[in-house]
Amino acid sequence: MKFFSIASLGLLLVVATAFPASELQREDGENSVTRNKPTRASSGKTRRQISYLIKEVFEMRKELCKNDETCIKSHVAVSENNLNLPKMTEKDGCFQTGYNRDDCLVRITSGLLEFQVYLRYIRNKFQEGNNRDRAEHVQSSSKALIEILKQEVKDPNKIVFPSPTANINLLAKLESQNDWQKVMTMQLILSNFEDFLQFTLRAVRKA
């Protein structure tokens, strides 16, 4: 019994010296750093997802405009809505000057989360057929993109989540519009979402 205890103690000492604590800690530290560093495969997947969304949003705009070129190319402004749609600014770190990958990813992810209530509104307006399917698919694809980007954000606590109460109030405000205003609002949302995705694609290519 004494021989077994001594042998066991010797084995534990060998294991402890073979794997120093500093080595294990260094490996954990390296893993935490590389976990947020995008691989070539993950970056390619992100770009493909964004490009796909841009294409689908453009198709939705065409359907909404009934393929009228003037309508498609115009960026309508419905001033009475006072919509606070997400936009990119220089301070977000996504532009050529002052590019900051971490700040940019936080802004992109937060912006996509802000757009969700507007995409839900559009989905509800498209009642049936291909329009409804495409609207649902655009929203689900944008949610998938958010999850991809969350994995690359260095500090997820910096991501800003919209207030559920504010979203409920916004939906009520949008629903109170007349039919013409609703169509113009949908066009405004889609054109701004497309612009946001274009900025996102350019920023992700730099990462």
Swiss-Prot record:
What are the Polar residues biased-composition ranges? 31-44
PROSITE patterns to which the protein is assigned, alphabetical: INTERLEUKIN_6 (PS00254)
Q: What gene is behind this protein?
A: IL6
| The organism's place on the tree of life at top rank | Eukaryota
Positions of modified residues (Phosphoserine): 74
Similarity field: Belongs to the IL-6 superfamily.
Q: What does the record give as the function of this protein?
A: Cytokine with a wide variety of biological functions in immunity, tissue regeneration, and metabolism. Binds to IL6R, then the complex associates to the signaling subunit IL6ST/gp130 to trigger the intracellular IL6-signaling pathway. The interaction with the membrane-bound IL6R and IL6ST stimulates 'classic signaling', whereas the binding of IL6 and soluble IL6R to IL6ST stimulates 'trans-signaling'. Alternatively, 'cluster signaling' occurs when membrane-bound IL6:IL6R complexes on transmitter cells activate IL6ST receptors on neighboring receiver cells.
Query: Where would one find the signal peptide in this protein?
Result: 1-18
Q: Where is this region: Disordered?
A: 26-47
Q: What is this protein called?
A: Interleukin-6
* Localization per record: Secreted
Q: Pfam family example for this protein? A: IL6
Keywords (alphabetical) are: Acute phase, Cytokine, Disulfide bond, Growth factor, Phosphoprotein, Secreted, Signal
- Organism, by scientific name, is Marmota monax
Which cystines does this chain contain?
A: 65-71, 94-104
Mention one GO molecular function.
cytokine activity
Question: Keyword Zinc-finger, does the record have it?
Answer: no
GO terms, biological process: acute-phase response; glucose homeostasis; hepatocyte proliferation; interleukin-6-mediated signaling pathway; liver regeneration; positive regulation of multicellular organismal process; positive regulation of receptor signaling pathway via JAK-STAT; positive regulation of receptor signaling pathway via STAT
InterPro entries, per the entry: 4_helix_cytokine-like_core (IPR009079), IL-6-like (IPR003574), IL-6/GCSF/MGF (IPR030474), IL6/GCSF/MGF_CS (IPR030473)
Q: Which residues cross the membrane?
A: none
Cellular component GO terms, alphabetical: extracellular space; interleukin-6 receptor complex
Q: How does it assemble?
A: Component of a hexamer of two molecules each of IL6, IL6R and IL6ST; first binds to IL6R to associate with the signaling subunit IL6ST. Interacts with IL6R (via the N-terminal ectodomain); this interaction may be affected by IL6R-binding with SORL1, hence decreasing IL6 cis signaling. Interacts with SORL1 (via the N-terminal ectodomain); this interaction leads to IL6 internalization and lysosomal degradation. May form a trimeric complex with the soluble SORL1 ectodomain and soluble IL6R receptor; this interaction might stabilize circulating IL6, hence promoting IL6 trans signaling.
